[in-house]
Each structure stands twice: as structure tokens, then as C-alpha cells.
Amino acid sequence: MRFNAFCDASFDRRTKLSGLAYHICGRVPSDVQEKSPVSMAGCLDGNHAEFVAVYWLLSEIVDYVGESAALCDVVIKTDSDHVERIWQGVVQERDVRKEELALLTACRQFCERFSSVNLEVVKGHVGWRQPEQTSCDK
């Protein structure tokens, strides 16, 4: 089983509030704020919010597939090159904020459950499209 999934986050510097959303192809888009106990006021900035979105996306897929996760390949698409640099190890762990390092560790634990997990950065992001317009493998 293969999952193509998209996630994005926004962060308001003035109010310090974040909006996080993700979409798993073939499922209805989810609003993380309604589904998670995480305080969205706790994000440090937009980069941290993007990492939280990746974490919640992985947790949602794990909840959805349960024990079948070992048979699943996951492709996560985000517009955050900051998350990609940390994910790929381009940034040394000593240079990563402790909050992001904790998220990376949690994401790696989720990744161990799947057959494979790949993170792709999609630049030129222009916001969410309707699910029927989103390119997904069937």
C-alpha cells in the first residue's frame, strides 16, 4: 500500500498562532487543530509549525493503517526546505533546536513502522487544492 500525503502550516508572528493541515490522498482533508491535543500556540515559528505538520501527518497514517504499517510506503510532500534539511541530516543535530530535535526523533520512531518513508519538498506552493485536483496515485 502506498500513501501520497501533503502537509502545510502557517504561522502568525503577531499572535504566535499556527494553523496546520494535512491531506492523505483518497481521504478527506483534516484540520489538525480539531484532531490533536497539541496547543497550536506552542509553535516557535513557521519552520517549527511545518515540522509539527509532518509529525501529525505520520501519526494520522499510523492510526489509520495500524499493524499494516510495515506494508506501507509513504511519500510526504511539504513546502518546507527547513524540515527537509533537518530530515536529511544536512543540518547537524547540535544546530537543531531541541523542540525540532524532539519532533525528528518522534518522526523517526513512526518511520520505523513503515516499509519506507520519503520526504519531498514541493516549491512554488500556492495553497491547498481540492482533493480531486490533487495528484495522487490510486
Predicted regions and their residues:
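RNase H-like nuclease fold core
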Residues: 1-52, 59-63
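RNase H catalytic domain
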Residues: 11-14, 55-137
